[in-house]
Amino acid sequence: PIGMIEVEPVDAESEVMEIVEPKPEPEGYNPTYGSTYDRVMDRGYVICGTKANFPGFSEKKLVEFEDRWVGFDADICRAIAIAVFGDESAIEYEVVDGRTRFEFLIDGTIDVLSAATTYTFSRNVEKKLEFLPTTYYDGQGFIVRRTLGVSSAKQLHGAKICFSGSGTAKNNIKDFFKLHNLDYVPVEVPVGKSVKDFYIDGKCDMYGTDASGLASNRYGFKHPERHVIL
């Protein structure tokens, strides 16, 4: 630790600057890296959790005749491997989804998570996870079929909305509809099923998540032009 300068006013016309010496560290103080670091170093590579088939962020593609993880989140995983080992290949990708991402991180299946995860106070405190600096700023979005004929989410009164029990979208949707005095019909997607697939199968009028996630999802639709992001 370094010393700091403390200013103590004496009267209205003068100030005395006192140099405060740093206090000695407590006896037995020995800062160390956490268990995750030790595990990674012993293993020799980083296990990074990321989503599959998430265009622009993380997906496996054929690059120069070999399968390679590409996208923003996948590149962050690769950057961590370079920072730790100086080798971008010192990485193993583990596929996660909205329900398994925290479970895998907590039980040690993965060392780090890079998978479009909203930073919230409750997640930071309750799950006892260390969030790294934010890498992407986004907001809540909604996706609907173009045939619905709406141009604003405020026109979705009475809509059937698919959501999963995990993630922040459920509460975001609830808050949005309450704020604008709109009713909706919730359609909860069972564990193991995809909200996106429920929507494609016509089981709801819309679903919501981060706007970037919706753009990525729509890119993979058979007819992306038939869907609108609000």
Task: For each feature predicted by the language model, list its residue ranges.
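Alpha-helix capping/helix-boundary segments
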Residues: Y119, G149, T168-A169, S194, ...
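Ligand-binding cleft/hinge of the Venus flytrap
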Residues: K61-E66, R78-S89, F131, A169-P190, ...
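Acidic, polar ligand-binding/catalytic clefts
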Residues: P55, R78, I82, G86-Q155, ...
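Short helix-initiation/N-cap motifs at beta->coil->alpha
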Residues: Y33, A90-E103, L148, Y184-D201
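Short, Asp-centered acidic motifs that coordinate Mg2+ and/or phosphate
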Residues: V46-I47, D111-V112, C204-M206, G213
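Second-shell loop/turn segments in exported
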Residues: E59-V70, A90-I91, R101-F102, G158-F163, ...
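Solvent-exposed, acidic/flexible segments
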Residues: N30-Y33, E66-C77, E94-G98, T135-Y136, ...
